[in-house]
UniProtKB/Swiss-Prot annotation:
Residues 862-939 form the Death domain. Residues 545-685 form the ZU5 domain. This is Netrin receptor UNC5D. Keywords: Apoptosis, Cell membrane, Developmental protein, Disulfide bond, Glycoprotein, Immunoglobulin domain, Membrane, Receptor, Repeat, Signal, Transmembrane, Transmembrane helix.
Amino acid sequence: MGTGAADRSRGARWWLPWLGLCFWAAGAEAARGADSGEVLPDSIPSAPGTLPHFIEEPEDAYIIKSNPIALRCKARPAMQIFFKCNGEWVHQNEHVSEESLDESSGLKVREVFINVTRQQVEDFHGPEDYWCQCVAWSHLGTSKSRKASVRIAYLRKNFEQDPQGREVPIEGMIVLHCRPPEGVPAAEVEWLKNEEPIDSEQDENIDTRADHNLIIRQARLSDSGNYTCMAANIVAKRRSLSATVVVYVNGGWSSWTEWSACNVRCGRGWQKRSRTCTNPAPLNGGAFCEGMSVQKITCTALCPVDGSWEVWSEWSVCSPECEHLRIRECTAPPPRNGGKFCEGLSQESENCTDGLCILDKKPLHEIKPQRWSRRGIENASDIALYSGLGAAVVAVAVLVIGVTLYRRSHSDYGVDVIDSSALTGGFQTFNFKTVRQGNSLLLNPAMHPDLTVSRTYSGPICLQDPLDKELMTESSLFNPLSDIKVKVQSSFMVSLGVSERAEYHGKNHSGTFPHGNNRGFSTIHPRNKTPYIQNLSSLPTRTELRTTGVFGHLGGRLVMPNTGVSLLIPHGAIPEENSWEIYMSINQGEPSLQSDGSEVLLSPEVTCGPPDMLVTTPFALTIPHCADVSSEHWNIHLKKRTQQGKWEEVMSVEDESTSCYCLLDPFACHVLLDSFGTYALTGEPITDCAVKQLKVAVFGCMSCNSLDYNLRVYCVDNTPCAFQEVVSDERHQGGQLLEEPKLLHFKGNTFSLQISVLDIPPFLWRIKPFTACQEVPFSRVWSSNRQPLHCAFSLERYTPTTTQLSCKICIRQLKGHEQILQVQTSILESERETITFFAQEDSTFPAQTGPKAFKIPYSIRQRICATFDTPNAKGKDWQMLAQKNSINRNLSYFATQSSPSAVILNLWEARHQQDGDLDSLACALEEIGRTHTKLSNITEPQLDDTDFNYSRQNGL
């Protein structure tokens, strides 16, 4: 028994005798009641309503921290009220009593309370909790109250079980478990979503009553969020770790479209139908639809058969009208499947008596003879024939003289080219003779060249007329031609000169006229009112790479250095006596083409213009792309931006079209177009095996802190212009390329990309914990056409004396390919080896015009076109030329051109602008059997000094 209980016992001894006397009296009364057969009650019996009745009994209580608690009792009628705690009487001095009178009953009401301290509860070591009870006395008996327990309140800090994050499909069940910390009294649990309380009474879909767990019966998209379990009692509140719940939507296929028409009009082709992963579209990391988005089946279209005539029948018997006839039928073969009917007459008739026939129903012998003889008739016919021929000769002579005089009167200077090699072929020199004595090619005030240009010259000028000289070749490919005499009128600046200007990031390169002639083109006026150069009223104003050049009838090539983008204007695409300032730009800002669904941008947005310019033959636009086209896992489209800013599909690369042509190479797409505008390539992955080609590179630079060194790892689309943007950014930041960039194949399998720094030298360098590996989500890499994707790592030296850094950087796709970049460098610029940004810097002028822009000499090109544009019974025509140059599809496009061979050669020029591989073209011609001499065997000495100065660099 505790010390306090003993004190209470000694203090109560003075009233115990009196209490015993009362009990003796009550016992006597009880004995008398027992003799009368009544049951002994718990309290001493008395008259009804005379025993003490508790109006207020002590309640269970909790001690918070060190604050004592008060236990109260109130009873009537009561002479005394005492507390008994743990079976021991509480000392009278610890009681506080108050007495009052109940006005309604006139009975005395006594109220007593005591304080229980934390120390008293802690010192008690009984089999049960610390408890206290009230005992009330009246003159007739006693009454006892309920036992009230007293406990020390607390709440542990750590949850026994924190809720865990979940990823569930839509309409799935979510169960978040929570076991609150141990506490007295037991903690109440409340759930928070995004720091807001959850009221399960207002949402029937949520249940929070099941053993502190949170149950969401059918997950909705709005149920995604951060959930927290909150536990609280009278002592404190505790928060669990937040659990992130993601409700995702797996993609579902839409219905199949109708089967497309057969892609060929004749023969074996294919039909396709497609569906999109939009029913529903994947959301919040949901799985992409499984299966193919495009289905293809073969189809066979009946080829149209044109009708052909049978042989003529025998002549019929001479009719009374002195005519006989013959017929033929269109049955060899007859037209079928929409083929053309035979052209020409199905029957012929002619006189069958050589003019001797009955006239007006009269016999021949009754016709009166004419006055002249048969010989006279023949002489009259000869006179008429010779008279007609003489008149024709005179008319031709007058026409030739008139044309010659007209051309001379409209020309400031001219040359007569006498080609003596046309019979034999080959590269020969030319004899020039001037029309006027003393005429030179120098610009003088008396001359008025056919050109008006609104800006100064910026680039080289070729001072010879490429059309004044023809190159011939000794080859059996070409048929001998008769002697020709060509008179060429030249426009001094349009045909002989070029105006170029390259602009990058808005910087203009000023230029002057060559040979010290610092004069603007605006001082030179044309003879007529129509200006030859049509200047642009506006150019693209977005963030872009841009280059411009002036092109005339000779055509040329416009190149964006180190971007893979180029524009080929064929010879003759621009009408004579006209020139255009043509520009080309690459959008480096936010792409205006927003991808739909699974479609991704595979190339830069390339703009060429002016948009209102018309060409007479298709030009070739080369656009780089980053798709791996070695396997058929892509559906690639060419798109064009409209004037309203929207994008519309021009064609699919695999489709047949007569409006444009797309030739897809491993790293670039060559497009033949008739109109200028903004174009881009997009791709829709057909399967998860579709691959994008990424270029990975690492740059490094010192940090502001002299001990830190920063590494930046880039993963960008494998297009030269994308990497050029990275190079430009790094140059501004002072970064240096530490290892040659490498190629990474990134699959469309929805798995993320990991970038890790490995093998850092210990005791020399260190990297912050948990930062050596970074992960990039799949969607960020797959659609990385917004800004260059990169991860930054910060390395710290232990001492300033460390100047060498070696490590490995691993770039890998989960369940995909990986690349290792080996970094071995010095952080001091004086000791670092410079790695060039590009394997071959393009230092050529952005614009080239005339023959220098083309790999195939113009004369050879003309003869190839003349040879292969002519149909051949053995099939050795332009179709064979296309086949030998790996052009096997959409041949109907070339069939619609006026010169299919010229368009094929334009495509060859676009594909071989870097290598100028004339050997491949020569081999193709040899295989066809039309030539036995390779074009690449043409040597420099065969060219005259005044010719086009082709060099080996131009492919010859």
